[in-house]
Amino acid sequence: MSNDTQPKIAIIGYGSQGRAHALNLRDSGFDVTVGLRAGGPTEAKAQADGFIVVAPSEAVKSADLVAILTPDMVQKKLYEEVIAPNMKQGACLLFAHGLNVHFDMIKPRADLDVVLVAPKGPGALVRREYEIGRGVPCIYAVYQDTSGKAEQFALTYAGGLGGARANIIKTTFKEETETDLFGEQAVLCGGASSLVQAGFEVLVEAGYQPEIAYYEVLHELKLIVDLFYEGGITRMLEFVSETAQYGDYVSGPRVIDAGTKARMKDVLTDIQNGTFTKNWVAEYDAGLPNYNKFKQADLEHPIEEVGKKLRAKMVWLNGQQQAAAAPANQQAA
Protein backbone atom coordinates (compact mmCIF):
# COMPACT_ATOMS: atom_id res chain seq x y z
CA MET A 1 0.00 0.00 0.00
CA SER A 2 1.16 3.54 -0.64
CA ASN A 3 1.69 5.90 2.28
CA ASP A 4 -1.55 7.76 1.65
CA THR A 5 -3.59 4.56 1.83
CA GLN A 6 -1.94 2.93 4.82
CA PRO A 7 -4.53 1.41 7.14
CA LYS A 8 -5.33 2.94 10.49
CA ILE A 9 -4.47 0.22 12.99
CA ALA A 10 -5.89 -0.72 16.39
CA ILE A 11 -3.74 -3.01 18.52
CA ILE A 12 -5.80 -4.86 21.13
CA GLY A 13 -3.51 -6.09 23.89
CA TYR A 14 -0.11 -4.82 24.98
CA GLY A 15 1.87 -7.83 26.13
CA SER A 16 5.14 -9.02 24.62
CA GLN A 17 3.89 -9.17 21.02
CA GLY A 18 1.37 -6.34 21.32
CA ARG A 19 3.98 -3.83 22.43
CA ALA A 20 6.47 -4.87 19.74
CA HIS A 21 3.82 -4.71 17.02
CA ALA A 22 2.55 -1.31 18.12
CA LEU A 23 6.01 0.26 18.37
CA ASN A 24 7.29 -1.17 15.08
CA LEU A 25 4.16 -0.20 13.17
CA ARG A 26 4.24 3.32 14.56
CA ASP A 27 7.90 3.67 13.65
CA SER A 28 7.00 2.43 10.15
CA GLY A 29 4.65 5.38 9.76
CA PHE A 30 1.30 3.84 10.65
CA ASP A 31 -1.40 5.52 12.72
CA VAL A 32 -1.64 3.17 15.72
CA THR A 33 -4.12 3.23 18.60
CA VAL A 34 -3.89 0.79 21.50
CA GLY A 35 -7.07 -0.71 22.96
CA LEU A 36 -6.89 -1.79 26.62
CA ARG A 37 -9.11 -2.07 29.66
CA ALA A 38 -9.00 1.02 31.85
CA GLY A 39 -6.73 0.27 34.78
CA GLY A 40 -5.43 -2.91 33.17
CA PRO A 41 -1.92 -4.20 33.85
CA THR A 42 -0.35 -2.72 30.71
CA GLU A 43 -2.25 0.56 30.33
CA ALA A 44 0.45 2.65 32.01
CA LYS A 45 3.17 1.01 29.91
CA ALA A 46 1.40 1.82 26.65
CA GLN A 47 0.82 5.40 27.75
CA ALA A 48 4.46 5.76 28.77
CA ASP A 49 5.39 4.57 25.28
CA GLY A 50 3.41 7.50 23.90
CA PHE A 51 0.32 5.74 22.60
CA ILE A 52 -3.25 6.93 22.75
CA VAL A 53 -4.92 4.27 24.90
CA VAL A 54 -8.68 3.83 24.77
CA ALA A 55 -11.14 1.07 25.53
CA PRO A 56 -11.05 -1.75 22.95
CA SER A 57 -14.63 -0.93 21.92
CA GLU A 58 -13.54 2.60 21.00
CA ALA A 59 -10.22 1.62 19.44
CA VAL A 60 -11.83 -0.61 16.82
CA LYS A 61 -14.54 1.78 15.64
CA SER A 62 -12.44 3.83 13.24
CA ALA A 63 -9.70 1.27 12.55
CA ASP A 64 -9.14 -0.15 9.10
CA LEU A 65 -7.25 -3.05 10.66
CA VAL A 66 -7.77 -4.52 14.13
CA ALA A 67 -5.04 -6.79 15.51
CA ILE A 68 -6.15 -9.08 18.34
CA LEU A 69 -3.01 -9.74 20.39
CA THR A 70 -4.52 -10.98 23.64
CA PRO A 71 -4.25 -14.52 25.11
CA ASP A 72 -6.09 -17.22 23.17
CA MET A 73 -8.64 -17.98 25.86
CA VAL A 74 -10.01 -14.45 26.18
CA GLN A 75 -10.33 -13.79 22.46
CA LYS A 76 -13.73 -15.41 21.88
CA LYS A 77 -15.52 -13.32 24.50
CA LEU A 78 -13.58 -10.21 23.50
CA TYR A 79 -14.55 -10.63 19.86
CA GLU A 80 -18.21 -11.41 20.48
CA GLU A 81 -18.86 -8.76 23.12
CA VAL A 82 -16.52 -5.93 22.18
CA ILE A 83 -14.98 -6.19 18.73
CA ALA A 84 -17.69 -7.59 16.46
CA PRO A 85 -20.36 -5.07 17.54
CA ASN A 86 -18.02 -2.12 17.02
CA MET A 87 -15.74 -2.85 14.06
CA LYS A 88 -16.61 -0.79 11.03
CA GLN A 89 -17.97 -2.41 7.89
CA GLY A 90 -15.33 -3.92 5.62
CA ALA A 91 -12.40 -3.62 8.02
CA CYS A 92 -9.65 -6.22 8.42
CA LEU A 93 -9.38 -8.47 11.47
CA LEU A 94 -5.87 -9.77 12.19
CA PHE A 95 -4.65 -12.56 14.48
CA ALA A 96 -1.14 -13.66 15.43
CA HIS A 97 -2.30 -17.25 16.04
CA GLY A 98 -5.11 -19.07 14.29
CA LEU A 99 -6.50 -21.21 17.14
CA ASN A 100 -9.83 -19.47 17.69
CA VAL A 101 -10.66 -19.03 14.02
CA HIS A 102 -9.47 -22.42 12.81
CA PHE A 103 -11.44 -24.29 15.47
CA ASP A 104 -14.56 -22.13 14.97
CA MET A 105 -14.56 -20.52 18.39
CA ILE A 106 -14.55 -17.18 16.63
CA LYS A 107 -16.77 -16.87 13.58
CA PRO A 108 -15.84 -13.56 11.94
CA ARG A 109 -18.47 -11.32 10.44
CA ALA A 110 -18.93 -11.96 6.73
CA ASP A 111 -18.07 -8.38 5.76
CA LEU A 112 -14.60 -8.50 7.32
CA ASP A 113 -11.27 -9.48 5.85
CA VAL A 114 -9.58 -11.95 8.20
CA VAL A 115 -5.83 -12.52 8.15
CA LEU A 116 -2.99 -13.85 10.26
CA VAL A 117 0.51 -12.42 10.71
CA ALA A 118 2.88 -14.20 13.09
CA PRO A 119 6.50 -13.14 13.63
CA LYS A 120 8.66 -16.18 14.32
CA GLY A 121 10.21 -14.82 17.48
CA PRO A 122 9.29 -13.34 20.87
CA GLY A 123 8.16 -9.74 21.10
CA ALA A 124 11.43 -8.47 22.54
CA LEU A 125 13.33 -9.90 19.56
CA VAL A 126 10.81 -8.48 17.08
CA ARG A 127 11.39 -5.03 18.54
CA ARG A 128 15.15 -5.31 18.95
CA GLU A 129 15.74 -6.51 15.39
CA TYR A 130 13.57 -3.73 14.00
CA GLU A 131 15.46 -1.07 15.96
CA ILE A 132 18.81 -2.13 14.53
CA GLY A 133 17.50 -2.15 10.97
CA ARG A 134 16.79 -5.84 10.58
CA GLY A 135 13.66 -7.92 11.04
CA VAL A 136 12.26 -11.21 12.28
CA PRO A 137 10.73 -13.55 9.66
CA CYS A 138 6.93 -13.57 9.55
CA ILE A 139 4.35 -16.02 8.32
CA TYR A 140 0.97 -14.85 7.08
CA ALA A 141 -2.34 -16.32 6.00
CA VAL A 142 -5.69 -15.22 4.63
CA TYR A 143 -8.85 -16.78 6.05
CA GLN A 144 -11.49 -14.50 4.57
CA ASP A 145 -11.00 -12.09 1.67
CA THR A 146 -14.15 -10.03 1.36
CA SER A 147 -12.55 -6.89 -0.07
CA GLY A 148 -10.11 -8.56 -2.43
CA LYS A 149 -7.32 -6.81 -0.51
CA ALA A 150 -6.88 -9.11 2.48
CA GLU A 151 -3.50 -10.42 1.37
CA GLN A 152 -2.33 -6.85 0.80
CA PHE A 153 -3.39 -5.96 4.34
CA ALA A 154 -1.41 -8.91 5.74
CA LEU A 155 1.72 -8.14 3.74
CA THR A 156 1.56 -4.46 4.64
CA TYR A 157 1.26 -5.31 8.33
CA ALA A 158 4.11 -7.85 8.16
CA GLY A 159 6.26 -5.29 6.39
CA GLY A 160 5.49 -2.74 9.08
CA LEU A 161 6.78 -5.17 11.70
CA GLY A 162 10.05 -5.52 9.82
CA GLY A 163 9.30 -8.95 8.43
CA ALA A 164 10.04 -7.94 4.84
CA ARG A 165 13.64 -7.23 5.88
CA ALA A 166 14.01 -10.93 6.69
CA ASN A 167 11.51 -13.34 5.15
CA ILE A 168 7.73 -13.58 4.74
CA ILE A 169 6.16 -16.98 4.08
CA LYS A 170 2.54 -17.65 3.16
CA THR A 171 0.67 -20.33 5.09
CA THR A 172 -2.91 -21.10 6.10
CA PHE A 173 -4.78 -20.74 9.38
CA LYS A 174 -4.94 -24.55 9.54
CA GLU A 175 -1.24 -25.06 8.97
CA GLU A 176 -0.12 -22.32 11.36
CA THR A 177 -2.43 -23.46 14.14
CA GLU A 178 -1.75 -27.18 13.94
CA THR A 179 2.01 -26.95 13.48
CA ASP A 180 2.37 -24.32 16.21
CA LEU A 181 0.47 -26.45 18.71
CA PHE A 182 2.38 -29.57 17.72
CA GLY A 183 5.76 -27.87 18.05
CA GLU A 184 4.87 -26.59 21.51
CA GLN A 185 3.50 -29.88 22.76
CA ALA A 186 5.73 -32.53 21.22
CA VAL A 187 9.08 -30.76 20.96
CA LEU A 188 9.66 -27.23 22.24
CA CYS A 189 7.78 -27.24 25.54
CA GLY A 190 6.22 -30.59 26.40
CA GLY A 191 8.79 -32.79 24.70
CA ALA A 192 11.88 -30.89 25.85
CA SER A 193 10.64 -30.40 29.42
CA SER A 194 9.74 -34.07 29.87
CA LEU A 195 13.03 -35.20 28.30
CA VAL A 196 15.06 -33.01 30.66
CA GLN A 197 13.12 -34.09 33.75
CA ALA A 198 13.43 -37.77 32.82
CA GLY A 199 17.16 -37.44 32.18
CA PHE A 200 17.64 -35.73 35.54
CA GLU A 201 15.66 -38.45 37.33
CA VAL A 202 17.63 -41.26 35.67
CA LEU A 203 20.96 -39.82 36.79
CA VAL A 204 19.87 -38.99 40.33
CA GLU A 205 18.19 -42.38 40.80
CA ALA A 206 21.46 -43.98 39.68
CA GLY A 207 23.28 -42.22 42.52
CA TYR A 208 24.81 -39.22 40.80
CA GLN A 209 24.82 -35.80 42.46
CA PRO A 210 21.73 -33.72 41.55
CA GLU A 211 23.95 -30.72 40.83
CA ILE A 212 26.00 -32.65 38.28
CA ALA A 213 22.82 -34.08 36.74
CA TYR A 214 21.40 -30.56 36.39
CA TYR A 215 24.46 -29.33 34.52
CA GLU A 216 24.49 -32.32 32.18
CA VAL A 217 20.82 -32.44 31.17
CA LEU A 218 19.54 -28.87 31.54
CA HIS A 219 22.24 -26.23 31.82
CA GLU A 220 24.25 -27.39 28.82
CA LEU A 221 21.13 -27.69 26.68
CA LYS A 222 21.44 -24.01 25.76
CA LEU A 223 24.82 -24.63 24.16
CA ILE A 224 23.28 -27.26 21.90
CA VAL A 225 20.12 -25.32 21.07
CA ASP A 226 22.15 -22.22 20.16
CA LEU A 227 24.05 -24.31 17.61
CA PHE A 228 20.76 -25.75 16.28
CA TYR A 229 19.47 -22.18 15.94
CA GLU A 230 22.56 -20.96 14.09
CA GLY A 231 22.98 -23.76 11.60
CA GLY A 232 20.81 -26.78 12.20
CA ILE A 233 21.59 -30.22 13.59
CA THR A 234 24.66 -30.72 11.41
CA ARG A 235 26.27 -27.53 12.72
CA MET A 236 25.78 -28.75 16.27
CA LEU A 237 27.50 -32.01 15.37
CA GLU A 238 30.43 -30.10 13.89
CA PHE A 239 31.05 -28.39 17.23
CA VAL A 240 30.84 -31.35 19.60
CA SER A 241 33.42 -34.08 20.12
CA GLU A 242 33.56 -37.23 18.04
CA THR A 243 32.57 -39.12 21.18
CA ALA A 244 29.45 -36.96 21.50
CA GLN A 245 28.70 -37.44 17.80
CA TYR A 246 28.95 -41.22 18.06
CA GLY A 247 26.73 -41.18 21.13
CA ASP A 248 24.23 -39.09 19.19
CA TYR A 249 24.16 -41.59 16.35
CA VAL A 250 23.79 -44.77 18.40
CA SER A 251 21.84 -43.65 21.48
CA GLY A 252 19.57 -40.91 20.18
CA PRO A 253 17.40 -43.40 18.26
CA ARG A 254 17.18 -45.61 21.37
CA VAL A 255 15.56 -42.75 23.29
CA ILE A 256 13.47 -41.30 20.48
CA ASP A 257 12.41 -44.44 18.66
CA ALA A 258 9.55 -45.52 16.43
CA GLY A 259 7.27 -45.75 19.45
CA THR A 260 8.01 -42.14 20.35
CA LYS A 261 7.29 -41.06 16.80
CA ALA A 262 4.00 -42.97 16.86
CA ARG A 263 2.98 -41.18 20.05
CA MET A 264 3.94 -37.86 18.48
CA LYS A 265 1.57 -38.73 15.64
CA ASP A 266 -1.14 -39.35 18.23
CA VAL A 267 -0.50 -35.89 19.66
CA LEU A 268 -0.81 -34.41 16.17
CA THR A 269 -4.05 -36.30 15.55
CA ASP A 270 -5.55 -34.90 18.76
CA ILE A 271 -4.59 -31.42 17.59
CA GLN A 272 -5.94 -31.90 14.08
CA ASN A 273 -9.31 -33.33 15.10
CA GLY A 274 -9.89 -30.69 17.76
CA THR A 275 -9.59 -32.98 20.79
CA PHE A 276 -6.81 -30.93 22.36
CA THR A 277 -8.64 -27.64 21.87
CA LYS A 278 -11.92 -29.08 23.17
CA ASN A 279 -10.16 -30.36 26.29
CA TRP A 280 -8.29 -27.09 26.79
CA VAL A 281 -11.48 -25.02 26.55
CA ALA A 282 -13.22 -27.34 29.04
CA GLU A 283 -10.24 -27.11 31.39
CA TYR A 284 -10.20 -23.31 31.19
CA ASP A 285 -13.96 -23.04 31.72
CA ALA A 286 -13.71 -25.33 34.78
CA GLY A 287 -11.22 -22.99 36.45
CA LEU A 288 -7.98 -24.77 35.43
CA PRO A 289 -7.94 -27.53 38.11
CA ASN A 290 -5.68 -29.92 36.18
CA TYR A 291 -3.58 -27.11 34.72
CA ASN A 292 -2.83 -25.84 38.22
CA LYS A 293 -2.07 -29.36 39.44
CA PHE A 294 0.37 -29.96 36.59
CA LYS A 295 1.98 -26.57 37.14
CA GLN A 296 2.47 -27.24 40.84
CA ALA A 297 4.01 -30.63 40.11
CA ASP A 298 6.59 -28.97 37.87
CA LEU A 299 7.34 -26.37 40.54
CA GLU A 300 7.92 -29.15 43.07
CA HIS A 301 10.15 -31.28 40.83
CA PRO A 302 13.61 -31.65 42.44
CA ILE A 303 15.33 -30.18 39.40
CA GLU A 304 13.78 -26.79 40.20
CA GLU A 305 15.31 -26.44 43.67
CA VAL A 306 18.68 -27.66 42.45
CA GLY A 307 18.57 -25.27 39.52
CA LYS A 308 17.60 -22.32 41.69
CA LYS A 309 20.65 -22.83 43.91
CA LEU A 310 23.04 -23.29 41.01
CA ARG A 311 21.72 -20.34 39.02
CA ALA A 312 22.15 -18.08 42.05
CA LYS A 313 25.90 -18.52 41.57
CA MET A 314 25.78 -17.76 37.83
CA VAL A 315 26.31 -14.00 38.07
CA TRP A 316 26.08 -13.56 34.31
CA LEU A 317 22.41 -14.53 34.49
CA ASN A 318 21.38 -11.62 36.73
CA GLY A 319 20.57 -9.22 33.89
CA GLN A 320 18.71 -11.90 31.95
CA GLN A 321 16.60 -12.81 34.97
CA GLN A 322 15.62 -9.19 35.51
CA ALA A 323 14.63 -8.83 31.87
CA ALA A 324 12.56 -12.01 32.12
CA ALA A 325 10.73 -10.82 35.23
CA ALA A 326 7.95 -9.32 33.10
CA PRO A 327 5.36 -11.93 32.08
CA ALA A 328 6.17 -13.54 28.76
CA ASN A 329 2.51 -14.15 28.04
CA GLN A 330 0.47 -11.47 26.37
CA GLN A 331 -1.80 -9.62 28.74
CA ALA A 332 -5.56 -9.51 28.42
CA ALA A 333 -6.99 -6.31 27.02
Swiss-Prot record:
Its EC number is 1.1.1.86. The keyword Magnesium applies. Involved in the biosynthesis of branched-chain amino acids (BCAA). Catalyzes an alkyl-migration followed by a ketol-acid reduction of (S)-2-acetolactate (S2AL) to yield (R)-2,3-dihydroxy-isovalerate. In the isomerase reaction, S2AL is rearranged via a Mg-dependent methyl migration to produce 3-hydroxy-3-methyl-2-ketobutyrate (HMKB). In the reductase reaction, this 2-ketoacid undergoes a metal-dependent reduction by NADPH to yield (R)-2,3-dihydroxy-isovalerate. GO terms for cellular component: cytosol. One of its GO terms (biological process) is isoleucine biosynthetic process. It catalyses: (2R)-2,3-dihydroxy-3-methylbutanoate + NADP(+) = (2S)-2-acetolactate + NADPH + H(+); (2R,3R)-2,3-dihydroxy-3-methylpentanoate + NADP(+) = (S)-2-ethyl-2-hydroxy-3-oxobutanoate + NADPH + H(+). It comes from the Bacteria. Pfam families: KARI_C, KARI_N. Mg(2+) 1 binds at D180, E184. The active site is at H97. Mg(2+) 2 binds at D180, E216, E220. Residues 172-317 form the KARI C-terminal knotted domain. Its cofactor is Mg(2+). Keywords: Amino-acid biosynthesis, Branched-chain amino acid biosynthesis, Magnesium, Metal-binding, NADP, Oxidoreductase. Substrate binds at S241. Pathway: Amino-acid biosynthesis; L-isoleucine biosynthesis; L-isoleucine from 2-oxobutanoate: step 2/4; Amino-acid biosynthesis; L-valine biosynthesis; L-valine from pyruvate: step 2/4. The keyword Nucleus does not apply. Binds 2 magnesium ions per subunit. This is Ketol-acid reductoisomerase (NADP(+)). NADP(+) binds at Y14, G15, S16, Q17, R37, T42, D72, M73, V74, Q75, G123. Residues 1-171 form the KARI N-terminal Rossmann domain.
